[in-house]
Structures are given as structure tokens and as C-alpha cells.
Amino acid sequence: MTDIIWGNGQKIISTDSFRINVTHRKDGNYDEYPDSVKIIISGVDLPGLSDNKSDWTVENLQSVIINAFLKCEIDSKTPEGDLIAKVSHSGAAGY
């Protein structure tokens, strides 16, 4: 099964990465995740953001990620501890 975390987008780092304030973790995750972590985006399901990474800008990411409640499905972790994940908007009540 895929590990999943939820939280609020905090800071855009680059055109394909941001920092998330983790507020929820899926029961049964294989790994443990800190309260704040860098996400490198492997894929998106975010209204207002193209599926094509080459179209992304810092401004695009800011408009759909900052202060949004996000779901991150973890693909892998870098040696530095950054998470590579598919990112989508998540409803607060149902995660």
C-alpha cells in the first residue's frame, strides 16, 4: 500500500517542489513523517495546474498549493529525506 500524508501547502521551493505542514498521516503508513517536509511532485491532480510539468511556474504552484489542504501519495524518499509524491487537493472532512 502507498503511504499517504495530508497537510497545508506552506512554501514553494521550485517549479516542482514545496514544503508541506503535515497534519494527518494514514493509519498503517510504513514510514514515519515529520511535521514539515519537502515534497517533490511526481504527479498532480490539482484543478488549475497543467499535468505537464514544463508548463509549471512558481506562480502557478503558489495559486494552487499555498494554504490548500493537500493529499500526498508517497512514491519514494530521497537520501536527503525529501518525499517524492503525487499531490491532490483533499476535502478536510474526508481527507
What are these regions, as identified by a protein language model?
Residues 1-95:
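Small beta-barrel nucleic-acid-binding modules, primarily SNase/OB-fold domains
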